[in-house]
Swiss-Prot record:
Record family assignment: Belongs to the universal ribosomal protein uL5 family.
UniProt superkingdom: Bacteria
Keyword annotations: Ribonucleoprotein, Ribosomal protein, RNA-binding, rRNA-binding, tRNA-binding
Gene designation per UniProt: rplE
Record-given protein name: Large ribosomal subunit protein uL5
Organism (species): Coxiella burnetii (strain RSA 331 / Henzerling II)
């Protein structure tokens, strides 16, 4: 069993159950999935950008990404419906916990000028989204072999019903959220 999964079952679940007064263990919020998304507008000019971004995504997530396509044509962005414009990966179960461990302990501390994650990035239903500007914060990506610095969006979906429950869950996992008072 994955380290964070064990932590969740043995310590986080009883703590949150007591804190929020849940009657059942199944009512305690848990992680559902983590979604990584890379929007690649520059793929319009160079089709190889998608392949290189997919290679980075495979190294980071350990799973093959799904290519996302433009839904409709947009003259302002010079794209047509059906053109590839990004890639995404959905992580669940063991891979999700492995990725979360690497994100919390390795990748986030390597972000330049990092002072904590914004507590305002919750969506109202306990899910948290964050953006990473450089994919090189992950140790799997070798700096010398990177053709371009690309960012990505990471969304952590939980079963929490409120932001407060989601915040307590992520704090218990060791997420470096800033205090709301500042």
């Amino acid at each position: 069993m994955v380290e964070l999964q064990e932590l969740y079952k043995k310590t986080i679940t009883p703590t949150l159950q007591k804190e929020f007064g849940f009657k059942s263990v199944m009512a305690v919020p848990r992680l559902e999935k983590i979604t990584l998304n890379m929007g690649l507008g520059e793929a319009v000019a160079d089709k190889k950008v998608i392949e290189r971004a997919m290679d980075d995504m495979i190294k980071i997530s350990g799973q093959k990404p799904l290519i996302t396509y433009a839904r409709k044509s947009e003259a302002g962005f010079k794209i047509r419906a059906g053109w590839p414009i990004g890639c995404k990966v959905t992580l669940r179960r063991d891979r999700m916990y492995e990725f979360l461990k690497r994100l919390i302990s390795i990748a986030i501390p390597r972000i330049r000028d990092f002072r904590g994650l914004s507590p305002k990035s919750f969506d109202g239903r306990g899910n948290y989204s964050l953006g990473i500007r450089e994919q090189i914060v992950f140790p799997e990506i070798q700096y010398d072999k990177v053709d371009a610095i690309r960012g990505m969006d990471i969304t952590i979906t939980t079963t929490a019903r409120t932001d407060e429950e989601g915040r307590a869950l992520l704090k218990a996992f060791g997420f470096p959220l800033k205090d709301e008072s500042r």
